[in-house]
Amino acid sequence: MRSDTIKKGFDKAPHRSLLRATGLRDEDFDKPFIGIANSYIDIIPGHFFLHEYGEIVKAAIREAGGVPFVFNTIGVDDGIAMGHDGMLYSLPSREIIADSIETVMNAHKLDALICIPNCDKIVPGMIMGALRVNVPTVFVSGGPMAAGHKKDGTPIDLATAFEAVGEHAEGKITDEELYDIECNACPSGGSCSGMFTANSMNTLCEAMGIALPGNGTVLAMTPRRIEMVKAAAKRIVEMAKADDSKYNLKNVLNEKAVHNAFVVDMAMGGSSNTVLHMLAIAREAGVDFPIEKINEIADNVAHIAKISPSLTTVHMDDIDKAGGVNAVMKEISRRGGLLYLENPTVTGETLGERIADAKILNEEIIHRNENAYSQVGGLSILFGNLATEGAVVKTAGIELNMRQFKGTAICFNSQPEAITGIMKHKVKPGNVVVIRYEGPKGGPGMQEMLAPTALIQGMGLGDSVALITDGRFSGATKGASIGHVSPEAAEGGLIAFIEDGDEIELDTDKHLLRLNVSDDVIAARKANYKPYKNEVKSKWLKRYQLLVSNASNGAVLKTEL
């Protein structure tokens, strides 16, 4: 066992002495040492109860014959960090989480790992760190919260609350109606109830085979979720005791698993952030997965499940009751060749064996391929002179009339500037809002743009205004919102040289994003270019700015300058 490095031999007497201080006894030194990476934190609704999960996992590991060691990672709530400079820290937190997993696991030579994430950057951060360690690993997330309901019974969620701010600013709803939404949008603990970033990533854990079935859809703190937590703990001990490299994470999360994740992502219309995170995960897994490959997948996968924010009446609990992610994968597999069904999973089954008996229980929630919302996937990578290295759009959330769009640019050099401009009614129908210098380097930190996109929706401009940015979006964003524009403005990308009134063209079917301005005009602008720079005071963000790559590379940190 890997942990023999710290517990076997006469020369490890000091090490054992320290371990005995934590309560270990003679018999424990022959058992596998299991790391429990918890992400318990009080301020995040999806995490404040995870200390209870940690205790359940500890007890189950001991009962199964392992020795558990809990450690914690940090976490950022993107919703609470939204719309102010706190959002600068969201994406960088992914790197801290990955580094912390690697540090604790390798410093103490633990044999196996069970990760308890739930929200946004915590899931991919834990996956990235676990891949570096490459020991047997199981993920068991906290689970989604239930959808909320207004007093009149209308289902709502966090996206409703953000859009309500724009509606209130326009006088479309009263103070009382806004308060009703505020108090009921997030009714319980768990990751926010739609197919936002957290639930997208928790769902993809199932597709990659690194979590148990139901990980992305079974509600938080329910008896079924608790049983899943116990089962995951039991399984990690079985994997650790086997002491077989076939269970090491990179042998499960391989190139085929990355492909499977993107297939399910397309079928369910996941968050655009999944592109950023899956590209980063692929790099940590040693998988060469060029961004262009995503469109090849999208063009062949039907979009069969539409969930909030794309369809506001459907939430993760509805998907669970309709058969869950297994039912989605089973339906996808009816069109042969889309999923690698022979790929292993942490349960010991192949993916094909896992989904063999899955059934769609409600075809109004999970559609058949032939009755899909679209015969192409819910995400698209756009290319063109504005995005020579790619940009990302969630096609699942775009109205049909906005999938081909030409509009005139109105430019903002930061998210706060854009929010002010939108609130002051500077944005008109037919505009393309450009928010730049918000990329990984420019922000730095690549802020999410939920506040401006929600304002656009709430103010009734969602079917007549597009938005492009080198920043990114919340999974709760909908509309013609194109993010991750690469190269970013801070790298001298063309987005830096757009001026008010320029024509911008997008076509999601053709994967096109183009600035319709002549090369001569662009060359003249470049000759007189004075780059905009955000003032960065934080030492951590300055380090991040120096090391981060662009979005087309997953915004991972470079290991060499």
Swiss-Prot record:
Amino-acid positions noted as binding [2Fe-2S] cluster in the UniProt annotation, renumbered to this chain: 119, 192
Obligatory cofactor(s): [2Fe-2S] cluster; Mg(2+)
Catalytic activity from the UniProt record: (2R)-2,3-dihydroxy-3-methylbutanoate = 3-methyl-2-oxobutanoate + H2O; (2R,3R)-2,3-dihydroxy-3-methylpentanoate = (S)-3-methyl-2-oxopentanoate + H2O
UniProt KW Metal-binding keyword: yes
Gene3D superfamilies (UniProt xref): IlvD/EDD C-terminal domain-like
InterPro entries, A to Z: Dihydro-acid_dehy_C, DihydroxyA_deHydtase, DiOHA_6PGluconate_deHydtase_CS, ILV_EDD_C, ILV_EDD_N, IlvD/EDD_N
MF terms in GO: 2 iron, 2 sulfur cluster binding; dihydroxy-acid dehydratase activity; magnesium ion binding
Residues that bind Mg(2+): 78, 120-121, 448
Record keywords, A-Z: 2Fe-2S, Amino-acid biosynthesis, Branched-chain amino acid biosynthesis, Iron, Iron-sulfur, Lyase, Magnesium, Metal-binding
Listed Pfam families: ILV_EDD_C, ILVD_EDD_N
Residues at the catalytic site: 474 (proton acceptor)
A GO BP annotation: isoleucine biosynthetic process
Keyword presence, Transcription regulation: no
Main EC class the enzyme belongs to: lyase
Involved pathway(s): Amino-acid biosynthesis; L-isoleucine biosynthesis; L-isoleucine from 2-oxobutanoate: step 3/4; Amino-acid biosynthesis; L-valine biosynthesis; L-valine from pyruvate: step 3/4
Cofactor comment text: Binds 1 [2Fe-2S] cluster per subunit. This cluster acts as a Lewis acid cofactor.
N6-carboxylysine found at: 121
Enzyme Commission number(s) from the entry: 4.2.1.9
One GO CC term on file: cytosol
Domain of life: Bacteria
Family from the record: Belongs to the IlvD/Edd family.
Function noted in UniProt: Functions in the biosynthesis of branched-chain amino acids. Catalyzes the dehydration of (2R,3R)-2,3-dihydroxy-3-methylpentanoate (2,3-dihydroxy-3-methylvalerate) into 2-oxo-3-methylpentanoate (2-oxo-3-methylvalerate) and of (2R)-2,3-dihydroxy-3-methylbutanoate (2,3-dihydroxyisovalerate) into 2-oxo-3-methylbutanoate (2-oxoisovalerate), the penultimate precursor to L-isoleucine and L-valine, respectively.
Subunit structure: Homodimer.
Protein name per its UniProtKB record: Dihydroxy-acid dehydratase
Taxonomic source organism: Sulfurimonas denitrificans (strain ATCC 33889 / DSM 1251)
Gene symbol of the encoding locus: ilvD
